[in-house]
Regions:
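Short, surface-exposed ligand- or partner-binding patches at beta-edge/loop junctions that are enriched
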Residues: 64
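Rhodanese-like catalytic fold shared by cysteine-dependent sulfurtransferases
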Residues: 1-22, 28-60, 69-103
């Protein structure tokens, strides 16, 4: 299995630099209601196949869930469907909340 992980520091750097990217939050709505990264595109995991045509292919697509397990599967699915810039956010929203936005 190939590693398509991006650390939370890498995502924070993309955001700070203003680099084009999309954060794809694949958690369920009740999970997103607890904590979310600003400007995330929220599409539950089970709905991803129906939204492939609307997702950005030309810049990094960083997929996240709670800890990075579901998003790892989705990042691999996206890569297998032509999204060469799909990445799994290592540690998920949990790592983001602990290391980048602890408030």
């Amino acid at each position: 299995m190939v590693n398509y992980d991006m650390g939370v520091e890498g995502l924070a750097r993309l955001r700070a630099e203003g680099a084009a990217h999309t954060v794809l939050d694949i958690r369920e709505p009740q999970e997103v209601a607890i904590c979310v990264i600003a400007d995330s595109l929220c599409i539950p995991m089970q709905q991803i196949p129906q939204h492939l045509e609307s997702l950005e292919r030309d810049h990094p697509l960083v997929v996240l869930c709670h800890h990075g397990m579901r998003s790892d599967m989705v990042a691999e699915f996206l890569r297998n469907n032509g999204f060469e810039n799909a990445w799994n956010l290592d540690g998920g929203i949990d790592a983001w909340a602990r290391l980048i936005e602890p408030e």
